[in-house]
Regions:
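Loop-helix junctions at membrane interfaces
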Residues: 1-202
Length: 202
């Protein structure tokens, strides 16, 4: 009898958490955390509590390079590190985690099915809108109430509702500026890191 022809082994799906990929995630978490400490005050309309940082660029890049699940985990780890020195009972860090997740999930999921720069550009634009809308909700129902609690029930002498009414435009513009800035930096770094990752075979 002749030996049966060996059937080709189908392509195996990539393992999600190999040592190499975990190391890659750890590096991006460290970079994101370190850069997030370099905050730039952006007191729009007198909102002195608004501070801009670009740490999430590395989280968004990770979402395209490895996938949305890895990016959300990395974001959670980064915000957990920031919680250690938080002065807001981790409310700001929790809000940032929610906002960042809202920003990156749609772009990174769609990118799985269509990997090109056009997909990145269009979906990041949508992500900016989603992040800004989520930020308004997070500030109204999470950050402002927590800060009011920390400062004896008021923010700058105002109730939560009054403070949000006074600062919502500043919050909207701030988060729009932040998400657009992160999108631009992501687009500038995306191609180089994508090629680098291919060489690493992660």
């Amino acid at each position: 009898m002749q030996d049966k022809e060996k059937q080709p082994i189908p392509n195996q799906p990539k393992k999600r958490f190999t040592p190499k990929r975990l190391a890659f995630i750890a590096v991006f978490v460290a970079l994101s955390y370190a850069v997030s400490l370099l905050e730039i005050p952006l007191p729009l309309f007198g909102a002195s509590f608004l501070k801009l940082d670009f740490g999430n660029v590395f989280i968004v890049l990770l979402s395209f390079l490895l996938g949305p699940i890895e990016a959300v985990i990395a974001c959670l780890l980064k915000e957990s590190l920031r919680c250690m020195t938080s002065s807001s009972l981790c409310a700001g860090e929790l809000a940032n985690f929610i906002i960042t997740s809202a920003y990156l999930l749609l772009p990174s999921i769609l990118y799985i099915y269509k990997k090109n720069i056009k997909t990145v550009l269009i979906t990041l634009s949508v992500g900016c809108v989603l992040a800004t809308a989520t930020a308004l909700l997070a500030n109204r129902f999470l950050i402002f109430p927590v800060y009011a609690y920390l400062f004896g029930g008021s923010i700058f002498g105002m109730t939560v509702t009054q403070a949000f009414s006074a600062f919502w435009v500043a919050v909207l513009l701030f988060n729009l500026i932040k998400s657009v800035s992160i999108s631009i930096l992501t687009l500038l770094l995306y191609k180089r890191l994508s090629n680098f990752l291919k060489r690493l075979k992660i």
